[in-house]
Amino acid sequence: MNTITIKTVINKKDFKKFIDFPYTLFKDDKKWVPSLVMDEKTTFDKKKNPALEFCDFKIFLAYKGPEVVGRVVGMINHKSNEIWKEKRIRFGWLDFINEDIVCQKLLEAVENWGRSEGMTEIVGPMGFTDMDKEGMLVEGFEEDCTMATYYNPSYYPQIVERLSYKKEVDWIQYRIKANQEIPEKIFRINNLIKEKYNLRIVEGLSA
């Protein structure tokens, strides 16, 4: 078994590895829906993401030999910590192969950086602000996902909990009951929108 090495992303070459890793990890997973690469890059661009005016972050990659096997971002939102009187470091963009040690080393890297910055608490997965995606999928792995929802394999929460992390709250990403009767109000709104914008439904045939 190769030793797991954690490295901090400090250049464009490593940042590309960070962006590309999920495409390798989930290449055979039909449930995974990738984020737009442009959006991911913008999120970490201090010139384009206003949140980075009050957030510090570090990106870590886990290696097994020359191969990237995991990634994570540690974030300190100074504005949030000041408002809520907390000393929290956040973690997000946590992706890793199905090995406890990889996740452990990644989270330890975030924890250690947090301690060095005076933080006393860690929480995640989160983004830079509370307007970003938050949480980890714990049920519904068989359901289709979208770009707007979180997706992760079922081993993620299992491994994180084995590392003594505790769930704080349960959220429902989305729930649609297809057998419910559609209210008349929805039909009226639908017709108004179609008339106002001159819309029509076109059914295409597959090739």
Please identify what each model-predicted range represents.
Residues D45-L61:
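A short helix-loop-beta-strand connector motif used in the catalytic cores of GNAT acetyltransferases and
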Residues D56-V72, E161, K167-D170:
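Conserved beta-hairpin
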Residues L52, F60, P66-V69, I76-E82, ...:
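Trp/Phe/Arg-rich N-terminal binding region typifying the photolyase-homology
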Residues E82-S164:
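Acyl-donor binding region in acyl/amide transferases
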Residues L36-E40, V72, H78-R90:
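A short glycine/small-residue-enriched secondary-structure motif
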Residues T3-I4, Y150-A207:
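Acyltransferase donor/substrate-recognition loop-hinge adjacent to the catalytic core
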Residues N2-K47, K196-A207:
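Short amphipathic alpha-helix that is part of the acyltransferase structural core
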Residues V72-I76, W93, V123-F128, V169-W171:
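Glycine-rich, histidine-containing beta strand-loop boundary motifs that form or position
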